[in-house]
Swiss-Prot record:
S-adenosyl-L-methionine binds at residues 185, 213, 218, 234, 294. One of its GO terms (molecular function) is tRNA binding. Its EC number is 2.1.1.-, 2.1.1.35. It comes from Pseudomonas syringae pv. syringae (strain B728a). One of its GO terms (cellular component) is cytosol. GO terms for biological process: tRNA methylation. The lineage of its organism: Bacteria, Pseudomonadati, Pseudomonadota, Gammaproteobacteria, Pseudomonadales. HAMAP family: RNA_methyltr_TrmA (MF_01011). The keyword Translocase does not apply. The active site is at residues 319, 353. Dual-specificity methyltransferase that catalyzes the formation of 5-methyluridine at position 54 (m5U54) in all tRNAs, and that of position 341 (m5U341) in tmRNA (transfer-mRNA). Keywords: Methyltransferase, S-adenosyl-L-methionine, Transferase, tRNA processing. This is tRNA/tmRNA (uracil-C(5))-methyltransferase. It is an enzyme of class 2 (transferase).
Length: 361
């Protein structure tokens, strides 16, 4: 659910979210949350637009939730990054001037980074040929972007099919490949604040870390520098490949990444059944003191929640405070909330990202 874009009301909206998080965590005697705000505009590093034909021209369009018939035609998008806003009119001029680029184009996706990288995906209702590829290569060079063409069963890449982000955590710069189509945190500035909070909350440890839902290694890279070893899990092949590249690019060599779901890892640790994907991984060699979880909106399922109970410290990043509270309720008899934080990843919406550190009583 969104609220109107109104930078003048930002502080009030953030306070309302803070009150909501405070209320949800009150039954667990949580401390006052640290609050990490967002830039008021130009904070969103990715944007997806449908194209809407009107007066023989195509316009960038978005739709209100539940209404795919009434387009909102856009010249720019104030919540999107400055790079996206700079690219939008120039790209539109180029496709209007090129029948090859324009023909049956129906969607445009932008992905940018704080480091200045940019990628554009053009989606078509037709096969893409050599003529399109030549026009796209010229366009990519003019705009200084990577460009991807997509149609049914087809993906053509000009440049790279990823962007590179650079984020500073506790004085060290980490480089991240962010693949086209894979999940990335949309608000880069707030993501950097999340990484630094998690790094500080975990602390310097002499034991090992288990990470569930590691994605492209967003948290894995900095947290790995705080512990002896990391065992990280992820099920998306695209994210696993990106995480492996990111570990290599950053010289992080104390992480073992396995493609298992949280539920499968629970079975493996409980010795319910063996997994071929764990071949060569000696689970008994790990001395886990902490677990880091960043689950989907549904939160942790009950079995995974019980798995985390066996760890002294549970570091939890949540995109849904209601399921976070439900998971804490399940763990409250053995773990207390030592730290909590609100990260305003999604200004002008009711969505909030939050973090808690749970420590065994």
């Amino acid at each position: 659910m969104s609220v109107p874009f109104d930078p003048a009301s930002y502080d009030r909206q953030l306070e309302e979210k803070t009150v909501r998080l405070r209320e949800l965590l009150a039954p667990f005697d949580a401390p006052e949350p640290q609050v990490f705000d967002s830039p008021r505009e130009h904070y969103r590093l990715r944007a997806e637009f449908r194209l809407w034909r009107e007066d023989q021209k195509r316009y960038y369009a978005m739709f209100a939730p539940g209404d795919n018939r009434t387009p909102i035609l856009l010249e720019g998008l104030p919540i999107a990054s400055e790079r996206i806003n700079a690219l939008m009119p120039v790209l539109r001029e180029r496709w209007e001037a090129s029948p090859t680029l324009n023909h049956k184009l129906f969607q445009v996706d932008f992905l940018t980074t704080l480091a200045g990288d940019a990628m554009i995906t053009l989606c078509y209702h037709r096969p893409l040929d050599a003529e399109w590829q030549a026009a796209a290569a010229q366009l990519a060079a003019e705009l200084d972007v990577s460009l991807i063409g997509r149609s049914k069963g087809q993906k053509l890449v000009i440049g790279h099919d990823y962007v590179t982000e650079k984020l500073d955590v506790a004085g060290r710069t980490f480089s991240y490949r962010q693949p086209e189509g894979a999940f990335t945190q949309p608000n880069g500035t707030v993501n950097g604040k999340m990484l630094n909070w998690a790094f500080d909350a975990l602390g310097e440890r002499q034991d090992d870390l288990l990470e569930l839902y590691c994605g492209n290694g967003n948290f894995t890279l900095p947290l790995a520098t705080r512990v002896r070893k990391v065992l990280a899990t992820e099920i998306s092949k695209t994210s696993v490949n990106a995480a492996l590249s990111n570990l290599d690019d950053n010289g992080v060599d104390n992480v073992t990444l396995v493609r298992l779901s949280a539920e499968e890892l629970t079975e493996a640790l409980n010795e319910v059944r063996p997994f071929r994907r764990l071949h060569g991984v000696d689970l008994k060699s790990y001395d886990f003191g902490s677990v880091f979880v960043d689950p989907p909106r549904a939160g942790m399922d009950p079995d995974t929640c019980e798995l985390t109970r066996r760890f002294e410290r549970i570091l939890y990043i949540s995109c849904n405070p209601e399921t976070l509270a439900a998971n804490i309720a399940q763990l409250h008899d053995t773990h207390r909330v030592e730290r909590c934080a609100l990260f305003d990843q999604f200004p002008y919406t009711h969505h909030m990202e939050s973090g808690v550190l749970l420590v065994r009583r």
